[in-house]
Regions:
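Sec-dependent N-terminal signal peptides
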Residues: 1-8
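Secreted, propeptide-processed cysteine-rich mini-domains
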Residues: 21-35, 69, 76
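Extracellular disulfide-bonded cysteine-rich modules/repeats
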Residues: 39-47
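Acidic glycine-/aspartate-rich tracts in secreted/extracellular proteins
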Residues: 49-51, 170-173, 265-267, 343, ...
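Extracellular hydrolytic enzyme modules, especially secreted metalloproteases
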Residues: 257, 265-410
Length: 484
């Protein structure tokens, strides 16, 4: 399945956002309650007489994992992660050169400290719920991967998948480096991504050859491979030719996805990031799932391929090429890796489809009143994480608990709560089928990042009332009942 071109305008035109001027005790500020970090302290804007001024401030922790909440969640997410692995710093600096563009990327996994619920609220027993099969909406059309299907079940779950890197050295540049040295930080993030999202164990593997494989052609010999685009005959021939060159040197046994890279010194304008595949035959069998990656080239200014070098969009494209996830369009705001623009981890439903979650972590809700305790989606835990309401054979409502941490460590505290959204598998448009459900308050926030329901908030959707009745570091307790 193809990642359509509308993604380019959303990811390559990275926004810039205003931030508060550096705070100083007694200096004027603009709005009561806002906070700002300066010189190792967190200052809060307070009312003093008829004026608004910054208070004396409180010393902040040295760890940037404990970010300070901002007025605009998107401004908060734009902050540069100074604790990112050092190998990503050239990309971070490259991004800053573009008018100090917003860096929405996550670069690492930050463990979430889950606590055990110690309250007295009784939740609905699993035996009183529907079977998980009742909530597994079936995909029967050619649209994006929103539901279960034979195509989905035939794919190896991410937690058990094997990805083969095919590093080629074209006549455009002769490298003295190695693929692992040049791209190891990306593959380490990829392995961390799968391992930490797989609550039930992982044997995921990225296979990286020791050196680049000689491919005696130039990228310029192939038309229409230079940008993010739809499949082309020239691009498919490129895949066939490079595999023919690599086949004598690589054992493709058990492979699920082929990742093509070239030395980062190659001009990024010669090769676009593309998730579409080509049927190729090797000594070990036939394969057709490919992900071609733009060179990590930071020397040629900002071009049409530049936005695809960052970790978030690389992972986004990977989930196009493997599991055929579509773009969730703007129906989710910034929620979900497959949304546009994506600023968070995968949605819980996507994780379930991809095999990161098991059936035991899903609560399929009946029409009768139910109460569920949901463990935060960022916690490394086999606890129940999704509550799903089956509306009909093609539509469900999904409920999950959101906290700061994991790969969502750049979210502000104001984004914590209960995320509610609708899945409609009747949609065949690659950019539709997933829709956020929230209050007027939540939908009015930047990128809808304030959409999660807070304590005592309620929404009504498709005849069901969804309420948050308790919350904490254990997650959220949610009450669901039919209204009609």
């Amino acid at each position: 399945m193809i990642a359509f071109l509308s993604i380019i305008s959303l990811f390559l035109t990275l926004p810039t956002f205003p931030v508060n001027a550096a705070a100083k005790a007694g200096a004027k500020c603009s709005k009561a309650g806002i906070t700002s970090v300066a010189s190792g302290k967190t200052y809060t804007c307070v009312k003093s007489g008829k004026k608004l001024v910054w208070n004396k401030g409180v010393a902040t922790t040295k760890s940037v994992d404990q970010f300070v909440d901002q007025v605009q969640p998107t401004t908060f997410i734009c902050k540069t992660d100074t604790l990112a692995p050092a190998a990503w710093k050239p990309y971070q600096d490259y991004l800053k050169l573009r008018n100090n563009a917003c860096d929405m990327n996550f670069y690492r996994f930050v463990p979430f400290e889950l606590t055990v619920y110690s309250g007295t609220q009784i939740t609905t027993a699993k035996s009183d719920l529907l079977s998980t099969e009742s909530c597994k909406v079936k995909k029967t059309n050619s649209g994006p991967m929103l539901g279960f299907s034979s195509q989905q079940s035939n794919l190896t779950p991410y937690s058990k998948a094997k990805f083969q890197v095919v590093p080629i050295e074209t006549t455009d540049y002769k490298s003295t480096s190695t693929p692992k040295k040049d791209y190891g930080h990306y593959f380490e993030l990829l392995e961390s991504w799968v391992k930490n999202n797989s609550d039930n164990g992982s044997s995921f593997e990225v296979r990286i050859p020791d050196k680049y494989i000689t491919f005696n052609k130039s990228l310029k010999d192939y038309k229409n491979i230079d940008t993010h685009n739809k499949p082309t005959p020239e691009g498919q021939q490129f895949h066939k030719d490079l595999i023919a060159a690599a086949d004598p040197f690589i054992d493709f046994s058990g492979n699920d996805l082929i990742i093509v890279v070239v030395p980062p010194q190659v001009n990024q304008n010669l090769l676009g990031t593309n998730p579409w595949g080509t049927q190729v035959t090797t000594q070990e069998g036939s394969f057709w799932r490919f992900l071609t990656i733009t060179p990590f080239d930071f020397t040629n200014g900002w071009g049409p391929n530049s936005g695809f070098i960052g970790p978030q969009l690389l992972l986004h494209e990977m989930h196009h090429s493997y599991f055929d996830f579509g773009d969730h369009g703007d129906g989710m705001g910034g929620w979900g890796l497959m949304s546009l623009p994506s600023v968070t981890d995968l949605l819980g439903w996507d994780k379930y489809l991809a095999g990161y979650y098991s059936d035991q972590q899903i609560r399929c809700l009946p029409s009768a009143k139910s109460i569920s305790l949901l463990t935060p989606n960022v916690a490394k835990s086999q606890n129940e994480k999704l509550a799903v309401i089956p509306i009909n054979s093609s539509k469900i409502i999904v409920i999950e608990s959101v906290r700061v941490g994991g790969f969502n460590y750049k979210l502000p505290k104001s984004s914590e709560g209960v995320l509610v959204y609708e899945i409609n598998i009747d949609e065949t448009d690659y950019h539709k089928g997933v829709y956020l459900i929230s209050t007027a308050r939540g939908l009015s926030t930047d990128n809808k990042l304030g959409a999660p329901l807070r304590l005592n908030e309620t929404v009504i959707a498709s005849g069901y009332k969804i309420s948050v009745i308790q919350t904490g570091n254990f997650g959220d307790i949610v009450e669901v009942q039919k209204t009609s």
